[in-house]
Amino acid sequence: MNSQKLTVNRETVIKITAVVAIAALMFSLILVFNGMIGYAADDYLYFFKYTGHVVKGTPERLTGIRDIFTGMVTHYKICNGRIPAHFLLQLFTLFDKSVFNVVNSLFFTLLGLLIYFHANYKRPINIPLLVFIYAFEWLGMNKPASAYIWYSAAFNYLWTTVWILTFLMFYRIHDTESEKPKPSKEIILSVLMFVAGVFAGWTNENMGGATMGAVMLFLIYFKIKKMPIRAHHVTGLLGVITGFGILLLAPGNRVRIDNTHRERNIMKHLLWWRSRYILISGVLCCLCL
């Protein structure tokens, strides 16, 4: 019996060591990639006090956090509502890029671990699954460097996704055996979940809406399985709705639409995407035949 237990423990230790080694390897690889790429395109704009995407006159360099807050008010009014991501974007311009390289590599590593957590929760350690997730995290992404390595995009997509998946952990770990928390703890957790939900919904237009849908599906699942729905589950959803509303109601969204010449008719957009889908499907069918 003891020898069997020792064997199980040894296997667990080996698997945990393998997980740590894989995560460390991914961190190191992405750190190298981050170090090979400098700033580009919109990155330079955010080194200065934000007055709009069209620079007029001589731009003034950021001098501190106060300049960032002032710029984000302008950003919300004339560009878009992605304030948390762009606040961090400007904040990291105050440091050497090596700081961003390290933190961004950590976020890439965390993304893989969080996906693994959600996919493998309450199951034995699955090393092949973790390897597949990290491989697909890069190979399955269209232009991965544009989402993970490019300075401006990393804040908007990589970092926000990590935050959302972390927020959703509090729905994933819920089960029927969980004891009802003390009222004082539930109040604190409810407030924290509301705040976390606001920032999860206030990420970007695609992921904010997806997060709201994911939380709703969790609550529906809890109801079907007759699992208790706690107050913090509800306040989390209210937070996501609030954050998503702040994002969508930004005056800058309307300003950007007014400054573009793209078609605004939603039906024409849907028909255009339908035609593209039919074309791609036809090409794939021909290739299969």
Segments from the language model and where they lie:
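Transmembrane catalytic cores of multi-pass membrane glycosyltransferases
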Residues: V32-L94, V102, Y151, G201-L289
